[in-house]
Design a protein with these regions (language model features):
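Charged DNA-binding/catalytic regions of mobile-element recombinases
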Residues: 1-165
């Protein structure tokens, strides 16, 4: 939850690629409605995945929050050809990557500034933070590389291995 100047709290949902830690989908709203927030982040992630090899065989991992295991979200995951996966209840390690990204978002953006003026202000700040996260922020889990660099190196290596001798 994110503090807003006009009273209600804002909420942000992220979808990330586990391999490169890239945030591939995100959305902000003033409610955690299952028909809005997580689905918007999922739709963005699926658009990104479709342009990077497709969605078949991908796994959508989430916690047991009602917004993620509800019929609307699980139906959409299935329509994309993805496999649903949820963590075990009461196990904080099962969703550690998501918790880490959420913690970084709050530490690096949310708690460093005054409350957001409105939803548009939150969305703009989140857009800038996600762009920075993917292209500039060094991640210890990636050997102090950015998600973009990790992907670039991976695809260059794949192309080199596929090239004829």
């Amino acid at each position: 939850y994110v503090r807003m100047a006009n009273g209600p709290f804002g909420c942000t949902a992220f979808a990330a690629d586990v391999f490169a830690r890239r945030i591939v989908g995100w959305a902000c709203a003033t409610t955690m409605d299952t028909g809005e927030l997580p689905l918007q982040a999922l739709e963005q992630a699926m658009s990104w995945a479709a342009s990077h090899g497709g969605t078949d065989g991908l796994v959508h991992h989430s916690d047991h929050g009602a917004q993620y295991i509800g019929l609307v979200c699980t139906t959409r995951v299935g329509e994309f050809g993805m496999l649903p996966s949820t963590g075990t209840v009461g196990d904080s390690y099962d969703n550690a990557m998501a918790e880490s990204a959420d913690g970084a978002y709050k530490t690096e953006l949310v708690w460093r500034r005054k409350p957001f003026q409105d939803l548009r202000d939150l969305e703009l700040a989140t857009f800038r933070w996600v762009s920075w996260w993917n292209s500039k922020r060094l991640h210890r889990s990636l050997g102090y590389r950015t998600p973009e660099r990790t992907e670039t190196e991976y695809y260059a290596n794949q192309a080199a291995q596929a090239a004829p001798l």
